[in-house]
């Protein structure tokens, strides 16, 4: 992790097309993003929770009306049956959690059925059944669902970057977007985002 790169991404930004602003601040071990977007006759406000990995900020973006959202990363370990997890949620906004996802199959892809458990501070989650499915229209995007006793509790969208999966997730009644923010230089920020209900990646440029 580069402290300079991390510092460069913080602060106030504006969309290059002039239709919105973005503020990024660090809160403990995570990052809070606030968007204000103007679209035709509508004003939209979004929030985001992010983790900084390899000089990039990976964010879960969601409407201000959403009660809970999370951001995560899966990284293959061992014999490809297991993925380690790094995650954060708005329920513990300033703290990173860990986890482990295990499946029976051995392959280098992320698709499959997993048993997964998460840890944060003194809390252990119940064991979830995690299903990861590649989106048909885009080999780089994935749909994720977390179930307990065959009932889906959470859903999410994942994107592959540097052989790791970064994801945005939350309750099944709400929309989430996984966003990758990276500095082009000190005054330009590149954004790539994918909505949970979409199969395309949207590009945006922020400046200051």
Q: Where are the regions that the model predicts?
A:
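Central antiparallel beta-sheet cores of small beta-barrel/beta-sandwich binding domains
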Residues: 2-208
């Amino acid at each position: 992790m580069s402290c300079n790169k991390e510092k460069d991404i913080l602060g106030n930004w504006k969309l290059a097309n002039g239709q919105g602003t973005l503020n990024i601040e660090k809160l403990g071990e995570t990052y809070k993003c606030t968007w204000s977007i103007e679209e035709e006759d509508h004003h939209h406000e979004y929030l985001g929770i992010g983790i900084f990995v390899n000089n990039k900020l990976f964010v879960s973006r969601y409407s201000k009306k959403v009660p809970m959202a999370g951001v995560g990363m899966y990284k293959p370990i061992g014999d490809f049956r297991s993925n380690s997890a790094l995650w954060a949620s708005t329920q513990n906004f300033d703290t990173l959690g860990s986890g482990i996802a295990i499946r029976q199959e051995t392959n280098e892809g992320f698709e499959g059925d997993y048993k997964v458990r998460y840890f944060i501070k003194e809390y252990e989650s119940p064991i979830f059944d995690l299903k990861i499915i590649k989106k048909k229209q885009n080999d780089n995007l994935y749909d994720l669902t977390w179930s307990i006793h065959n009932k889906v509790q959470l859903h999410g969208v994942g994107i592959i970057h540097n052989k790791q999966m970064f994801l945005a997730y939350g309750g099944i009644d709400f929309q989430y977007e996984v966003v990758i923010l990276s500095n082009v230089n000190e005054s330009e920020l590149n954004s790539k985002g994918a909505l949970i209900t979409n199969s395309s990646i949207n590009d945006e440029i922020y400046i200051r």
